[in-house]
């Protein structure tokens, strides 16, 4: 697959979340964080419809923007998910990609006096 040939059937939106939980964290990392949201095909056609959500979090050394990386001739996860929902092979869901990267070089998904309240951010604010 050529990287320039992907045209999503659903919609990808990029947001910025201002986090109270991460404001003033011990590492001085940003409290404004990127948040990506994918809505499946047909989402805008039924404004009252409700969809389950899936939260995609990367491993310790992963960064949010790494989800867009691809291996040669293979689709990345956002493209695979879009294709799966467009074909109807899975029930439609909203997919949310969350950034919890720290200046220590890894993502955190817990509340810690050393890094900040990432679990609170993830579970209560996102």
Question: Where does each model-flagged region fall?
Answer:
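Non-catalytic cap/lid and distal C-terminal segments of serine-dependent acyl enzymes
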Residues: 1-125
């Amino acid at each position: 697959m050529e990287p320039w040939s992907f045209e999503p059937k659903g919609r990808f939106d990029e947001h910025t979340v201002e986090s109270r939980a991460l404001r003033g964290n011990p590492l001085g990392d940003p409290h404004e964080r990127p948040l990506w949201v994918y809505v499946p095909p047909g989402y805008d056609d039924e404004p009252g419809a409700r969809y389950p959500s899936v939260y995609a979090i990367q491993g310790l050394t992963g960064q949010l923007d790494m989800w867009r990386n691809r291996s040669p001739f293979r689709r990345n996860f956002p493209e695979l998910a879009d294709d799966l929902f467009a074909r109807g092979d899975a029930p439609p869901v909203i997919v949310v990609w969350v950034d919890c990267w720290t200046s220590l070089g890894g993502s955190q998904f817990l509340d810690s006096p050393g890094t900040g309240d990432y679990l609170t951010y993830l579970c209560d604010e996102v």
